[in-house]
Amino acid sequence: QSSAQEHSQLPVGTPVNLRKLLAETLELQTVASRKDVATLARYTDCPHSAPALKALAEDDYKAQVQQKRVSVLELLERFPACDLPFGVFLELMPLLTPRYYSISSSPLQSPERCAITVGVVSDPALSGNGTFEGVCSNFLAQSPEGATIHASLRDTSDGFRLPEDPSVPIIMVGPGTGIAPFRGFLQERAALKDSGKAIGEAILFFGCRHPDQDFVYRDELEGYAKDGIADLHVAFSRQEQSKVYVQDKLREERDAVWALLENGAKIFICGDGSRMEPDVR
């Protein structure tokens, strides 16, 4: 009950399946905080495990917990001598938060349907123990065709919308699943062009590893290029010995990009901002 007061979304007053509770309401893979680790240490009487947990909560925390993204659950598996009450465990766990995806389709093309582009996350855990699997991406990948998925819509920021005037040129940079919103942009402009409206020039810089592995929407994108909806420039980072990224393609096409910018083009970037955006800029 005390846990539920702080976690108001937890089911209270009704029986609940333990698996459902853990899988659908709690963030089990969240990195343990110093306070979390110290709490585990307080519930550990083992003369070997207790000092080890105390060290992880203090000097060793950054290198051994934070940087390796070790969760409370993983620490409990590593230190079975910890006698943490389940109610306290619930108090330590944050609630499952929404996962946000860009809609990768246009209502002008499919008014009653929307698409999302999801990369399934399943990689070796940074801790070196097991596999880190994305909660939502794997849930979606494992859902059978025809399954009902509960979702909500959020309005996008004003800065990430197609110009109201379709004749304004646009430049799009999106490696990997960063292609998602731009697929919607291109569908929108294709529909506008089909309706007889003039559309501005567009350039799409897309990046993936290999043309035969993860060139998503290849036929569709090449079709847009053929139809004059957008110039397509694709960077393959694993096709040859030398790695090519979207920023390299931007550099190659700098004259065309600069010409569009001088003509009032709007530029959009979607992807891993921490690594790609500085190079793009």
Region roles according to the model:
Residues Q1-R281:
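FNR-like FAD-binding dehydrogenase module
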